[in-house]
């Protein structure tokens, strides 16, 4: 593999440790819980869910962390203020590691950061996210909270190029008059996690992968993405699976999506990724072995370059 000349930031947060040079620390893996239509959710607006099933999923991911050495993160999604607050209160009771505060609603994200601060578990939380769409109200809410970690999205809708992604981090690019990294610093963020914002294939997916190298080479920050979304937005794959189902090949239709879904995480890992948002937490037993194997290959090749894998690295645990 390779080593970056730039000194690389290591994220040491809420018991998780990732980042650094390729092959140094294993990739952190974040599974999403309470996502849209998640079968364990009984009322998505109020945040009512099967607590036993939720705890089992979180524990299974934690077990995979113990087995492979890859740090586990829990991405908590809630569509409303009430739901997200209920969810994160529960997760904080059963999980001591990092959790992402995630919602399509800015109000819900703000409520979650406020609740985490008041309840004393903000040091576990990763805000998702600081991006060009953040408004003054949400920024001030984040700044007033005790949250110290955040996903920072390097996406400029006016310039999806690699240069555009770097510019939006440094100076706001063509969309904002301030860089996302400056915003993060002003909000009190000590642990910025750079999401390279993978778009569908044919619309810039390759730029995001290349941006992973660029961000680490130029800024030395931890990078990653939710690259598993690429197969879901792939029209050809959707039609191919439809054809398989019409031929009565239901299981293969399911399997081919799983292969592409989990395989996408390998792409991000090979592209010097430090963390991967791998999708449904239900897939922990698929995602962790695949990424751990990739990490092992990277670490083995990086040894000749002077990179020593951490004691908890899969290369030291799974052979």
UniProtKB/Swiss-Prot annotation:
Q: Name one GO biological process term.
A: methanogenesis, from carbon dioxide
Provide the catalytic activity annotation.
5-methyl-5,6,7,8-tetrahydromethanopterin + coenzyme M + 2 Na(+)(in) = 5,6,7,8-tetrahydromethanopterin + methyl-coenzyme M + 2 Na(+)(out)
Keywords of this entry: Methanogenesis, Methyltransferase, One-carbon metabolism, Transferase, Translocase
Q: What is its EC number?
A: 7.2.1.4
Q: Does the keyword ATP-binding apply?
A: no
Give the GO molecular function terms. Answer: tetrahydromethanopterin S-methyltransferase activity
Q: Give the record's subunit note.
A: The complex is composed of 8 subunits; MtrA, MtrB, MtrC, MtrD, MtrE, MtrF, MtrG and MtrH.
Matching entries from NCBIfam families are given as: mtrH
Which function does this protein serve? Part of a complex that catalyzes the formation of methyl-coenzyme M and tetrahydromethanopterin from coenzyme M and methyl-tetrahydromethanopterin. This is an energy-conserving, sodium-ion translocating step. MtrH catalyzes the transfer of the methyl group from methyl-tetrahydromethanopterin to the corrinoid prosthetic group of MtrA.
Q: Which family does the similarity line name?
A: Belongs to the MtrH family.
What this protein is called in its record is Tetrahydromethanopterin S-methyltransferase subunit H
Q: Which organism is it from?
A: Methanococcus vannielii (strain ATCC 35089 / DSM 1224 / JCM 13029 / OCM 148 / SB)
